[in-house]
Swiss-Prot record:
<keyword id="KW-0256">Endoplasmic reticulum</keyword>
<keyword id="KW-1000">Mitochondrion outer membrane</keyword>
<feature type="region of interest" description="Disordered">
    <location>
        <begin position="73"/>
        <end position="101"/>
    </location>
</feature>
<feature type="compositionally biased region" description="Basic and acidic residues">
    <location>
        <begin position="91"/>
        <end position="101"/>
    </location>
</feature>
<keyword id="KW-0446">Lipid-binding</keyword>
<dbReference type="GO" id="GO:1990456">
    <property type="term" value="P:mitochondrion-endoplasmic reticulum membrane tethering"/>
</dbReference>
<feature type="domain" description="SMP-LTD">
    <location>
        <begin position="1"/>
        <end position="437"/>
    </location>
</feature>
<dbReference type="GO" id="GO:0015914">
    <property type="term" value="P:phospholipid transport"/>
</dbReference>
<comment type="subunit">
    <text>Component of the ER-mitochondria encounter structure (ERMES) or MDM complex, composed of mmm1, mdm10, mdm12 and mdm34. A mmm1 homodimer associates with one molecule of mdm12 on each side in a pairwise head-to-tail manner, and the SMP-LTD domains of mmm1 and mdm12 generate a continuous hydrophobic tunnel for phospholipid trafficking.</text>
</comment>
<dbReference type="GO" id="GO:0000002">
    <property type="term" value="P:mitochondrial genome maintenance"/>
</dbReference>
<keyword id="KW-0472">Membrane</keyword>
<keyword id="KW-0813">Transport</keyword>
<dbReference type="GO" id="GO:0045040">
    <property type="term" value="P:protein insertion into mitochondrial outer membrane"/>
</dbReference>
<dbReference type="InterPro" id="IPR027532">
    <property type="entry name" value="Mdm12"/>
</dbReference>
<feature type="compositionally biased region" description="Polar residues">
    <location>
        <begin position="215"/>
        <end position="240"/>
    </location>
</feature>
<feature type="compositionally biased region" description="Polar residues">
    <location>
        <begin position="371"/>
        <end position="381"/>
    </location>
</feature>
<feature type="compositionally biased region" description="Acidic residues">
    <location>
        <begin position="73"/>
        <end position="85"/>
    </location>
</feature>
Amino acid sequence: MSIDINWRTATSGPDGEALAERIRSFIHDRFQQVALPRFIRSVQVHSFDFGTIPPELEIKDFCEPFADFYEEDDDADTSDVSEDLLSEHSSQWDRTHSELNEPPYREESAMNHGLRDPFHEGFPPSPLRSPLGEHLNPHFLPRAGTPGIPGGTSNLGYHLMSLGGLSGTQTPLAAVAGGNPFASGWSDSGMGFGNRGRSERQGPIPQHRPEPEIDTSNSTSRPSTANTLPSHLSESNNLNADGATGRNERGSLHNGDPLADHTCSGHLPLPPRMRERRPEDFQVLCHAKYAGDVRLSLTAEILLDYPMPSFVGLPLKLNVTGITFDGVAVVAYIRKRVHFCFLSAEDADALIGSEQQQESGGDDHRPRSGADSSAHTSQKRQGGLLQEIRVESEIGRKENGKQVLKNVGKVERFVLAQVRRIFEEELVYPSFWTFLI
C-alpha cells in the first residue's frame, strides 16, 4: 500500500520551520564534536531546507512497537504516572495505609500476597532510578543504543526475574513477535520494591519458615549496584558513541560478575522502567525511497600552510543540493509519542527481505541468479542507506571548472563522510527520535 504525502503542508509553516531549525542546530552541534583534520579549522551549519520533492512510501507491515520504544525517561515520568497509574491506584490508598499500620508480621498475609506495588507504599525511589533514567532519550533527541537489532539491554527488563532464562539480543522480528513483555505476570513497577517493602514491614523471619536460598547476611559489605553502572550520562552521551557504552555496561549484567554479586547479596539490579503496552499502540514499517532536493548549507575554514603552517584561513562554502535514499523506515505510535528511525540493511532484510529480493529482479521481472543477486545486494549495501549526496562548493576563482586549492576535494569528502555518519548513527536503529504530539 502506497502513501501520498502533502510535502508542502508537512514541511512549511511555523511547525515546519521550527523542525528545520532544530535539525540544523542538531547537525551543527554534532560537527562541533567531530575531531577535525589538520587542514580544517571549523565547520558551521547555516541552513537546512526540506525541499519540494516528497519521498515515496510503501507500507510493508503493521506490527507491535519495538521493546526499546517503551523505555521511560524521567522527563516524561511525571505526566504519565500522575495521569495513568495514580488514577488506577487511587481507590486503594485507604487500604494501603491501614495495612501499613498493622502488626509488623502476619503469616497469612505474607504467604498469600505477591510483590506489592510501590505506588501502594510510600517508599522512596531507588537510587538506581536516576542513573538508569537520565540518559534515556530526551525529547527530540536521538538515543544511541547497543549495536545490533533490537533487544539489546531491553531484554533485561523482560527476563530479569527468571535468572536462569536470560535471553540475548534479538532481531526486530523476534522482539515484535515477543508480544506482551509482562505476560509472565511480573509487573515492572513491582520488580524493584516488592521484596524490600514486605521485609521492612514483616521484621525477622521465624525459625519455622524455610531459609532463603540467597545469603543476605553479608549484604552490607557488597558494593552497590550504582557503582557497577554508569553513575551519570550527560545529554552528549545521547549524541555520540558514549551512549552506546552506557547501554553495553547495562548489558554486561547478563553474564558478568555484577549480576552474580547482587544475586548473592539479595539485591537485584533494577531494569529500566517500561511503559505499559496498550491495545492502541502500533508500528508501521515503510519502504522509503527518496531522490529529492533537500538542501543543507555549510561553511568550512581551510587552513593555508604557505608560506608557513596555518598561515591563513579561507572560508569554503558547501551546499548539499540533494540526496538519494533507499531504506526501511519505522514509525511507532505510543500514547502521545511518535518514535521514528530507519533500519540497517541487514535488519531490513530480516523483516522484509523476501519481498525486496523479488523486486530486485531485472527489468524483465525475472529473478536474478545467485551470483547476480549477491552482487546486487553487496553493491547496494556498500553505499549504505544514503546512496548519493550531491554537493556544490564555492571558493575563490576557478580554472577550467576546477578549484585552485588542492584541499577543496579533501574538505568535501570529509564533510560528506560526517553527514553520512551522523545520519546513520542518529537515525538508524537502535537509535531513534521521539516526537511529542
